[in-house]
């Protein structure tokens, strides 16, 4: 047989096996998840009184964990720190309970080894980066049990963890929990010592709580009346898992419906032919699914009869539709629709992009998609917004793989575009279409840049997710420029997966990609996704059927790639990667045009053109090259800021070129008065359309737009105060530059400049007259807003909580300003002499008889050396700031914080590299570009202006 026949044969066998467990009389179900140390440890704790003695009921499970402790004292699981912590905590509790076991005299020593491991691991644990089910309840519960044995730990996030624990407890309605099934039954072991397990026997289903061995074990431990049903369930699971190793249990069993629905929906989504998969078997599955859906009145849970969830319900409804046993989505919508997204179930900590992607996919398969148009648009908006606001890839709370979210989001969003192309869903806006297109291309860009040399993206299941994503997004016309490379990548991924498909190796720890209390793998899922990835058509849909996306230029990405590809920083990057950045940049253009200007319409005139089309590339490419991509929203905020800086700076330059000292003194006073008034910028005065705005009105409008930015409102007063101060110093420094230029014109260029030293001038006036420093501090406020929004507290905190950190950040800003000033001067020498703008090489340190720089080449070389020095000082400063911030927020978060702030620095560094490339005035470089000498042609008669010539040298974000 060929590969296609083999794929269908594997799919057929998989579904027949699962269906047999579903319909065979007497079957208690099936589950192919790997056994877990965590759940096995809970079962090992179960004891009961027999003949007046306390006896452990499942001693064989304790023997298993006893024999599988690792050399460092831990039980590692998938190798992640959090799984090692949770596993080891549970096993340490079990060890302490079994310390009196005379047959294992080294238990105390093993317990000390586990304790030593935890003492170190808990100190390294970053709670804010943790995504495990109920970890904020489970870890405190286990720590409290250890307290009873005299074992305690101190660690940096101890108080934060217990505050989360107390907050969650305070929200629980115990009477409601005891009354009926809820998702909390899945993790009730976390409430040992809090919950009254005697009030829960009626919630048992087939001897278990939501198919969870750990909760069932906790119930047996704490209920005062022994329940034979629960004991029988645990014994049965141990028996089922005997082939996996001696006396273990998984995190979930049975998983019959979960495995059927997830496996079959994946096979359908990726074009497996149901006619080749035993149609009678599939029909029996459909009838059983419909039976349970009817019993649940249109919704169902992970296990029928338990808490309803949107994930299970949505996929079941979709399958019934494609298996010709349709059921209405009405009850599903009523149960799960929330104001801005669909919830998975009650009590969830946060919304899930994968759940909403599944809901969207399901509604798009309804017989009449337009009936649910408002819900479809709502979910699509939510999913697109998640991608819009996320840096890099989107991770989800149900799967550790960064590609799982990409797979489900791409399937749903591309099908949305397909349906829209058929004339459905007419209320979808052009803005949403644009955001969907950007989201999809973000996925493909990140995946292409992350493939490993062997063709994989991690384990086989993760590689399957990535390949399926590529197949879906390849349906978009936006991929045309990189389609050849895309197909090569897909072929290399298939070459990696095909031998694995035939070999069927046993699962390894790295295959545990599914998130529960610890991670786990599921054999049927690995098979289903592997078969799906090798079968999916490439592209999933004909690109001509995705016909309603806003058109984008097919030439601009090539121009951007060719122009910026000349820079040393980009030369090593392959052509496809530079083109990918070009496509991302081109997609951002309409988004920038949609944002209202932060300046006056009259001020904006003449400020548009090719330069603004180049701007997104200058933000996307450097960040991506460093492996620190920012969110689309963050990039847009930066671009809007640059546009506002450019327009404001341009207007002031052009209108102040003939200003007298008296004019400048008057404007300085107005600026100081404006920023000294605490009421300033709380409201904005209207300016009649029939006159040009005054200088102070332009400055006020610009400052107002930043200080009242909607994504900076939750920044602390200290951080916003720093932004306010930076804006004031920038405009005052601009006036000081104008005053210097007046003196320069009066004195003449041939006279030696007397006064402030070059060092002091570049570090005070020169650095302050750099718009990029405003951008850095504005990014600080955006970050502060994000931090305080996540905290959900009215007590707003500073991004940098200590005087040392604040000083270090301001030092980075100063070095950045000085670097920008020097770089601007280095690349503007000819322009500044022609226009009589003060430049670094006009200072006596460069022109004096003993300066050692008596030639233009020597002066430029000296200035280049200083520019390199300050650029390195900026890099070193940011790196040191990361190190000092790490103890406060954790290593990953510290790095993420600084990456957000550094975006504008990378943008300016690119300008510096452009200047070094041309070694001439940037405006001359732009003239070359417009003539086509650098391989970039004119488009529609407009030149590709890369910067502007100004009176005082403040060229937008670069300066």
UniProtKB/Swiss-Prot annotation:
Residues the record marks as active site: 311, 649
Keyword field contains Cell membrane: no
UniProt-annotated binding residues for Mg(2+) 3: 824
EC number assigned by the record: 5.5.1.-, 4.2.3.-
Region of interest (Class II diterpene cyclase), ranges: 1-542
Biological process annotations from GO: antibiotic biosynthetic process; diterpenoid biosynthetic process
Sequence motif DDXXD motif, residues: 649-653
GO molecular function: isomerase activity; magnesium ion binding; terpene synthase activity
Cofactor needs: Mg(2+)
Class I diterpene synthase: region residues: 543-959
Keywords assigned: Antibiotic biosynthesis, Isomerase, Lyase, Magnesium, Metal-binding
Residue ranges that the Swiss-Prot or TrEMBL entry lists as coiled coil: none
Outcome after substituting residue 649 to L: Completely blocks class I DTS activity, abolishes the production of premutilin, and leads to the accumulation of mutildienyl-diphosphate
Function: Bifunctional premutilin synthase; part of the gene cluster that mediates the biosynthesis of pleuromutilin, a tricyclic diterpene showing antibacterial properties. The geranylgeranyl diphosphate (GGPP) synthase catalyzes the first step in pleuromutilin biosynthesis. GGPP is then substrate of the premutilin synthase (PS) to yield premutilin. Premutilin synthase is a bifunctional enzyme composed of the fusion of a class II diterpene cyclase (DTC) and a class I diterpene synthase (DTS), with the corresponding domains and active sites containing characteristic aspartate-rich motifs.
Domain topic, free-text comment: The class II DTC active site contains a DXDD motif from which the middle Asp acts as the catalytic acid in this protonation-initiated cyclization reaction, while the class I DTS active site contains a DDXXD motif that binds divalent magnesium cofactors required for the catalyzed allylic diphosphate ester ionization-initiated reaction, with the first Asp playing a particularly key role.
Family membership noted in the UniProt record: Belongs to the terpene synthase family.
Name of the protein: Bifunctional premutilin synthase
Organism: Clitopilus passeckerianus
């Amino acid at each position: 047989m060929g590969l296609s026949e083999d794929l269908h044969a594997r799919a057929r066998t998989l579904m027949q096996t699962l269906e047999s467990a579903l319909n065979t009389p007497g079957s208690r179900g099936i589950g192919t998840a790997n056994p877990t140390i965590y759940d096995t440890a809970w079962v090992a704790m179960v004891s009961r009184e027999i003949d007046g003695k306390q006896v452990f009921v499942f001693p064989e499970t304790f023997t298993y964990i006893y024999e599988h402790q690792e050399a460092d004292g831990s039980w590692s699981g998938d190798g992640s720190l959090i799984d090692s912590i949770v596993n080891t905590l549970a096993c340490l509790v079990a060890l302490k309970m079994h310390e009196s076991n005379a047959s294992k005299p080294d238990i105390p020593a093993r317990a000390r080894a586990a304790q030593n491991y935890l003492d170190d691991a808990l100190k390294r644990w970053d709670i804010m980066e943790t995504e495990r089910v109920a970890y904020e309840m489970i870890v405190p519960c286990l720590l409290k049990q250890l307290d009873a044995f005299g074992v305690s730990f101190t660690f940096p996030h101890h108080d934060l963890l217990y505050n989360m624990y107390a907050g969650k407890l305070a929200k629980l309605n115990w009477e409601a929990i005891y009354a009926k099934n809820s998702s909390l039954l899945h993790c009730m072991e976390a409430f040992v010592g809090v919950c009254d397990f005697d009030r829960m026997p009626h919630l048992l289903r087939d001897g278990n709580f939501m198919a969870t061995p750990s909760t069932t074990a906790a119930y047996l431990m704490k209920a005062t009346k022994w329940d034979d049903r629960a004991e029988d369930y645990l014994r049965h699971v141990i028996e089922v898992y005997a082939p996996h190793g001696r006396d273990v249990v998984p995190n979930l069993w049975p998983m019959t419906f979960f495995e059927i629905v997830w496996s079959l929906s994946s096979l359908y989504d990726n074009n497996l032919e149901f006619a080749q998969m035993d149609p009678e078997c599939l029909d029996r599955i459909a009838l059983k699914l419909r039976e349970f859906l009817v019993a649940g009145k249109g919704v169902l849970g992970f296990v029928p009869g338990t808490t309803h969830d949107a994930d299970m319900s949505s996929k079941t409804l979709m399958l019934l539709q494609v298996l010709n046993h349709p059921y209405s989505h009405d009850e599903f919508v009523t149960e799960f629709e929330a104001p801005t997204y669909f919830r998975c179930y009650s009590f969830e900590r946060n919304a899930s992009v994968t759940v909403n992607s599944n809901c969207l996919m399901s509604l798009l398969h309804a017989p009449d998609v337009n009936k649910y148009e408002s819900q479809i648009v709502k979910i699509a908006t939510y999913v697109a917004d998640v991608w819009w606001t996320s840096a890099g890839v989107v991770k989800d709370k149900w799967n550790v793989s960064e590609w799982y979210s990409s797979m489900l989001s791409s399937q749903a969003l591309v099908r949305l575009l397909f349906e829209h192309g058929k004339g459905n869903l007419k209320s979808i806006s052009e803005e949403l279409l644009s955001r969907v297109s950007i989201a999809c291309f973000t996925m493909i860009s990140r995946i292409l840049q992350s493939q490993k040399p062997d063709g994989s993206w991690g384990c086989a299941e993760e590689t399957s997710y990535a390949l399926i994503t590529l197949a879906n997004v390849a349906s978009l016309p936006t991929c045309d420029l990189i389609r050849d490379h895309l197909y090569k990548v897909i072929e290399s991924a298939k070459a990696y997966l095909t031998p694995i498909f035939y070999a069927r190796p046993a699962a390894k720890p790295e295959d545990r990609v599914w998130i529960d209390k610890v991670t786990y793998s599921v054999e049927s899922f690995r098979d289903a996704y592997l078969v799906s990835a090798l079968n999916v058509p490439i592209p999933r849909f004909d690109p001509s059927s995705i016909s309603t996306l806003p058109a984008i230029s097919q030439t601009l990405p090539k121009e951007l790639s060719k122009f910026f590809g000349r820079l040393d920083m980009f030369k090593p990057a392959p052509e496809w990667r530079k083109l990918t950045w070009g496509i991302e940049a081109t997609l951002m253009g309409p988004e920038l045009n949609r944002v209202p200007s932060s300046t006056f319409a009259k001020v904006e005139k003449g400020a548009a053109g090719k330069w603004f089309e180049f701007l997104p590339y200058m933000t996307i490419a450097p960040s991506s090259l460093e492996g620190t991509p920012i969110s689309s929203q963050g990039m847009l905020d930066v671009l809007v800021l640059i546009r506002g800086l450019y327009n404001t700076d341009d207007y002031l330059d052009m209108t102040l070129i003939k200003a007298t000292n008296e004019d400048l003194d008057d404007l300085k006073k107005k600026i100081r008065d404006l920023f000294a008034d605490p009421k300033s910028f709380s409201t904005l005065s209207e300016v009649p359309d029939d006159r040009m705005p005054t200088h102070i009105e332009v400055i006020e409008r610009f400052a107002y737009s930043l200080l009242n930015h909607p994504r900076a409102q939750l920044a602390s007063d200290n951080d916003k105060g720093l932004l306010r101060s930076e804006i004031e110093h920038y405009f005052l420094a601009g006036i000081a530059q104008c005053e210097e230029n007046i003196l320069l014109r009066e004195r003449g260029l041939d006279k030696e400049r007397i006064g402030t030293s070059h060092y002091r001038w570049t570090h005070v006036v020169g650095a302050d007259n750099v718009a990029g420093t405003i951008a850095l501090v504005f990014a600080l406020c955006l970050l502060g807003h994000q931090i305080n929004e996540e905290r959900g507290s009215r007590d707003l905190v500073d991004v940098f909580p200590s005087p040392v950190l604040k000083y270090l950040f301001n030092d980075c800003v100063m070095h950045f300003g000085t670097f920008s000033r020097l770089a601007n001067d280095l690349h503007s020498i000819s322009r500044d002499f022609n226009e009589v703008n003060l430049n670094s090489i006009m200072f006596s340190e460069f022109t004096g008889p003993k300066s050692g720089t008596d030639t233009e080449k020597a002066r430029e070389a000296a200035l280049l050396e200083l520019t390199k020095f300050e650029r390195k000082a900026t890099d070193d400063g940011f790196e040191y700031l990361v190190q000092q911030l790490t103890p406060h927020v954790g290593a990953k978060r510290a790095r993420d914080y600084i990456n957000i702030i550094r975006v504008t620095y990378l943008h300016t560094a690119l300008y510096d590299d452009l200047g070094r490339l041309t070694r001439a005035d940037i405006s001359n470089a732009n003239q070359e570009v417009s003539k086509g000498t650098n391989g970039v042609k004119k488009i529609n008669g407009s030149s590709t202006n890369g910067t502007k010539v100004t009176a005082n040298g403040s060229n937008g974000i670069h300066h």
